[in-house]
Amino acid sequence: MPTSISTAPLSQGSPPSSLIDYQPQSVPSSSSPPPSTAAAAAAAVVVAVPSSSSPVDLGLPSFTSTSSLITSDVPATTTTPSFTGSVIGSISRRNRRSFAALAREKTSSALANLSSIGSTTNSSLRQSASSGSLQKHSRKASQLSVGEISGFVPLSPPLSDGSGSSEQSSSAPFEPLSAVTEQPNPAAERRRQTIQLVPPISENIPVSPAKMHQTSSRLLRMTEDDRPFTKDFMDLFSTLMVSLKLDSHRVRFTKYDHTFTSEEAINNLGSLKFSQSNRMPDPKDPSRIVTTTTTTTFSMAKEMARSVCQRFVDARFIESVDGKYSHTFPLKGALYQLTPKGINILQRFCQRNGITARHVIDVLESPRNTMQLVNLERDTETDKLSHDRATIEVIFRRFAGQDGPNVKSSVSSSDSDSLSDYSNGLVGVKMARERKVGDKICANTFTGKAAVDWLMDCSTTIEPRETVLIAELFVKYGLITVLQEDRSMPQVENSLVAFQPSKNAIYAITERGQRVCGWLARDKPRDTTTYDSRGIPRDSNNARLNHILQDPALRLLFREFLRFSLCEENLSFYIDVSEFTTQYHKFDKVGHFKKPDAVRETLAAAYGLYNAFLAPGSPCELNIDHALRNSLASRMTKAVGDDDSMLKSLQEVVQLFEMAQTSVFKLMSSDSVPKFLRDPKYSAILQEHDVDDLIGGGRSYSPTPGNVPERSMSRSQRS
């Protein structure tokens, strides 16, 4: 839910909000000569006021994705002279201390004013919004280092304490102090114990006349049952892992690599900042370098950080090195490591955002990075799992084992709590070769606990309730059957069918389930012709791709195929842009863009997509038309000023994104779809889904000739 944000200059005695782009007027020193006019035109210094980490801490966690563009025209050949004791050029250490003292004095005054206001009014205060920046630097390419012109440069800065100063070259004079304030939100107060999207503490953003400076501030999306949306939850986890050192720790006489303490995780989660940056030549002037940066900031109180860490444990993203499970995340004294599932999620986040930090790459290259997760399809509006029969059958094939059952020789080994057998996600649930159930000896049986363990460790489920729901659907669709109930376990109200995630509940694969997973010969496909939703025969690759994209089960298989083919970014971009444009048209229809905050937030999302998929050298750079790429670059790097021009800019960006989406659609339909339909690994499954008429002729094609698929890689990592 977007928050209301207003920007207005403050008078000398006005109390600043908890987040301010603070730009004090220069104070001439009696001992320092005034700077020359030429020097003042060449450069200026912006000093940010150090602020406390949370002047008004209500215990609300926050998450915000911000993006902005600031144009600063500095002649490439201009050099800035130095003046001792002056704010122009290089500043001596003594004067830095004087600026810090001035900053502290102004901060103390601001906090005093805040306190006086708090004693005379009932209105509540929250942390307010800040913004990232996209800066356009007027420097020649010859003046840049190799790292600057090499393309996408991700930034993973250390945690910010909310204080500090920055220096920014600009030809513009200082502007009046501006503040961002936020109105209290009653809904937020009712959701005090949920993760919330609010702004970061401080960003040192210079203000210039030609700028696009937007702030994105919104509540973190929550589901009906008060859990964060899966994508946001995984992004929060991955950002935390990138911020940690993940070095070696010793426990008694054992050394554990790539680990972290519970205290480090809680402290870092209290204030996280992730930035991704992209440098490229200006399409209109190659001698200028344009830098686009998207900043995401998470912030929350200590107890909430502890609760979120426990959610990471419950989702099997991290685990204690001693293998012991605790229902409450310890404040200190415990050592944790990423699970294979957590490493896989971190890897996908790093590939999308181009993260190449050495300590993260070491984890991704470690022997523990073996998992191939089943990426479950979710509803974009509610985040609920797709639960149609076809999608559940796709999940079931991996659950049961595509190459046969994962049989253990004894009941004790099949029922053990060890999860090492699931380290790669390519084998099915652990089954006992023979088990006595009542008076019968049954083959290939498994427990209810083994089923939910596999679903939690080998798929993108994030809480146990989702695993039970999927297992219930296995029973409902006749894929598994119960052989022995756990009578000591109470029945769950409002459940679809009875499924018990217990060690004492015994289940087996039905005959239909064995046919679905390929253990038994399939029935002969029906000789029918199917049509798409518009009644048009699917006689073209475009229509075939439309059918695949509209079917969650086929879309899941198609994504897996593209991942093995090293071009999954095409489908990811298509789906992400579909969500973005759908939201845009929905807001536009109801007049939501009359609010400047909605425009700024939507533009921030647009820059996130652009930096990930479309900017030159981005980690998941797409293969699109050169002219379209230049049009996108020109539009995304153009400075705008007032709210009307930002809305016009957003409209143009949406049109260009839709053109890029069409280009990617044509690429997938002409190149990927024919190969997907001819792949022998999927041909039998496609027949089972009544899409046998989609399968084209010609030789078979498979990007994965071996049993173990090649890992997904972003385009920037391919050689």
Swiss-Prot record:
GO BP of this protein: asexual sporulation; conidium formation; intracellular signal transduction; negative regulation of signal transduction; positive regulation of sterigmatocystin biosynthetic process; regulation of conidium formation; regulation of secondary metabolite biosynthetic process; regulation of transcription by RNA polymerase II
Keywords recorded for this protein, A-Z: Signal transduction inhibitor
Entry note about domains: The fungal-differentiation regulator (Fungal-DR) domain is only found in fungal regulator of G-protein signaling (RGS) proteins that regulate differentiation pathways. It is required for function.
Stretches with biased composition (Polar residues): 1-17
CDD domains, per database record: DEP_RGS7-like, RGS_FLBA
Transmembrane segments: none
Region (Fungal-DR): 214-411
Protein's UniProt name: Developmental regulator flbA
Bias (Low complexity): 123-135, 158-171
Organism: Emericella nidulans (strain FGSC A4 / ATCC 38163 / CBS 112.46 / NRRL 194 / M139) (Aspergillus nidulans)
Highest taxon of source: Eukaryota
Domain DEP per the UniProt entry, residue ranges: 425-511
Domain RGS: 540-685
